[in-house]
Amino acid sequence: MERFRPLLNKVAMGTALNRDEAAYAFDKMMSGETTPSQMGALLMGLRVRGETVDEIVGAVSVMRAKMLTVDAPVGSVDVVGTGGDASGSYNISTCASFIVAGAGVPVAKHGNRALSSKSGAADVLAALGVRIDLAPAAISRCIAETGIGFMFAPTHHPAMKNVGPTRVELGTRTIFNLLGPLSNPAGVKRQMVGVFAKAWLSPLAEVLKALGSERAWVVHGSDGLDEITISGTTDVASLEDGRVHTFEISPEDVGLTRAAPEALRGGDAEHNAAALRAVLEGAPGAYRDVAVMNAGAALLISGRAASLRDGVDMAKASIDSGAAKAKLDQLARATQALAPQVDA
């Protein structure tokens, strides 16, 4: 711990940590070797100054090293958000995940229960009859057999229990809100990550580049959504061929109609489960349109689609053919069957 105090002093002076220093600090915190005061001081010092790319890379590398991993096919994708956008939207990325899987791209979905919203990915999946408490080996089998699997964050990141109480006591956003979406237990190399603030677009794309991602989009809607929105434009930082570039997209680009922000709002887990099921069963409207736009982007990132419009067309076909709904049914059945294999 002799090295930790000097790092605290560095942060207190407003000086950035290098990648190795950040990794050391987060290893000590996640191993339970720091006091709550030390942990809180470091987290708030980083938050006030603003976390750097190297600090996030160092922290994520530790989180990934400590996680319980899952095997997934090469080419698997994840569609995930940081949360914290206060939008109250329905579970867009979860719905999009079934659409992507229905289009033939394996999905290794990583998520949690609601932290700042009424319904997180885990909550809505449980309401849809999906068991979220599978052991890593069972999830690997689930993805292999059905083309989609859900990894419940607390199961795969046991070291987080050492920082959880301090995060709750702080009661404000910290670097850990960024680390979860960047720490997929299946090690996917292609992902779409939604963020709660536009300022994080390019930095998180650079983090993904440093951590070995092949292709990724980091997105933020003009309405504040940590997804691609259809109520306005969406800013994108795209990682492709080792380069990050930024651009803006709109629903009109792919033939979709804008909707009011209220049209994307959801409710509790039961409400959102019914909405998600309705979309997969072919119901028209804003819920469908925002899901197919997000799924279309994921299909582009995966390499299955040649353009965003092509991806949106594939996403629509995934729903209209019944393939997306079939993935939900397959996931529910597979997780129920595999549930007895859960570790005691």
Swiss-Prot record:
Binding of 5-phospho-alpha-D-ribose 1-diphosphate occurs at: 81, 84-85, 89, 91-94, 109-117, 121
Q: Which residues are listed for anthranilate 2 binding in this entry?
A: 167
Can you supply a Gene Ontology BP term from the record? L-tryptophan biosynthetic process
Q: Reaction catalysed? A: N-(5-phospho-beta-D-ribosyl)anthranilate + diphosphate = 5-phospho-alpha-D-ribose 1-diphosphate + anthranilate
What Gene3D superfamilies is this protein classified in? Nucleoside phosphorylase/phosphoribosyltransferase catalytic domain, Transferase, Pyrimidine Nucleoside Phosphorylase, Chain C
| Domain of life from the UniProt record | Bacteria
Q: What is its EC number?
A: 2.4.2.18
Enzyme class, spelled out: transferase
Q: What does this protein do?
A: Catalyzes the transfer of the phosphoribosyl group of 5-phosphorylribose-1-pyrophosphate (PRPP) to anthranilate to yield N-(5'-phosphoribosyl)-anthranilate (PRA).
PANTHER family assigned to the protein according to its UniProt record, in alphabetical order: ANTHRANILATE PHOSPHORIBOSYLTRANSFERASE
What is the name of this protein?
Anthranilate phosphoribosyltransferase
